[in-house]
Structure formats: structure tokens, C-alpha cells
Amino acid sequence: LIERLKEPNKNCWSPIGGKLEMRLGESPFECAIRETREEIGLEISEGDLHLFSMISEKAYEGSCHWLMFLFDCKKRIDSLPRNISEGSFAFFEYGEIMSGRIKIPETDRTLLWNIWEKHRDGMVVLRADCGNILTSKIEQVI
């Protein structure tokens, strides 16, 4: 995980990721490959990735609407990546992430990591409303 130095999720531990280069017509897979290379220096291909979730998030941080594509990367790393301008890295076990001992975004604790734990070998489509009270609805499980 990366301890983010910038918004969104500043000062929280989060999976690596980023935004699609929409003006270039970048696909979610191309974005995941690029962000992995940029953030941790790992060269991967589409075959290293498994898309396990698509989440539509309404009112994230009270204002914006996000469409997230969550991937599990089958290619593993042995050592921590070098620190980057966006933050520093650490390895954590799933139980440690969910324990509350490390600071992660509430939406990650409530949704993202539970989805990873239950559906990382399949596919789930989910809609979340991050308004005053976080609500979510699974729309499809494959």
C-alpha cells in the first residue's frame, strides 16, 4: 500500500492507482499497467491482471462521482518500491489492514477490502453512495 501525501485520501494507506488518460482513449487495463509502472516500477501486462470489480461511487468526498476498476495483480514483488512524490510504501497483511491499526479510507475498509476478500477470484459490480451515510448495492456477481 502507499501512504498518500496528496488528495484524495491524504495521509491514508491505499492501493496504488490513478485516473484514466481519457484524452488518449486509455482503457482500464492500460491505465492499471501504466500506473503500476509509474508508481512501483513494475512492468506488467494484461495477462498479469484480473479485473475483479467495477464500482460506481456517488458523492465521493461529498462532491465527485467516480467509476473505479479494481484489479488483482498476479505478478508479485519481493521488496518495497522506492518512495515517490505521492507517498511511501509498506506491505500489510489483510488482517492488519482490517484491524483499524493503520489509517485507511473508510470506504476502503467498508467496501474495497471486503470486495477483494470475497470476490478477487470472480467479478462483482457495485454501486456506492458516499453521501452522509455510506450505502452500497451489489448489482451483479459473476
Briefly describe each language-model feature range:
Residues 115-142:
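Charged phosphate-binding loop/patch that engages nucleotide di/tri-phosphates or the phosphate backbone
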Residues 21-31:
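N-terminal phosphate-binding loop and adjacent alpha-helix
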Residues 81-115, 136-141:
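NUDIX/MutT-family hydrolases
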Residues 20, 44, 55, 75-76, ...:
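Hydrophobic pocket-lining residues within nucleotide cofactor-binding pockets
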Residues 1, 68-72, 91:
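Conserved hydrophobic/aromatic beta-strand scaffold that supports enzyme active sites
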Residues 1-15, 44, 50:
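N-terminal strand-loop-strand
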Residues 57-80, 109, 113-119:
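Active-site-adjacent beta-strand/loop module that shapes the phosphate/pyrophosphate-binding cleft
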Residues 16, 32, 36:
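Hydrophobic alpha-helical positions that pack around
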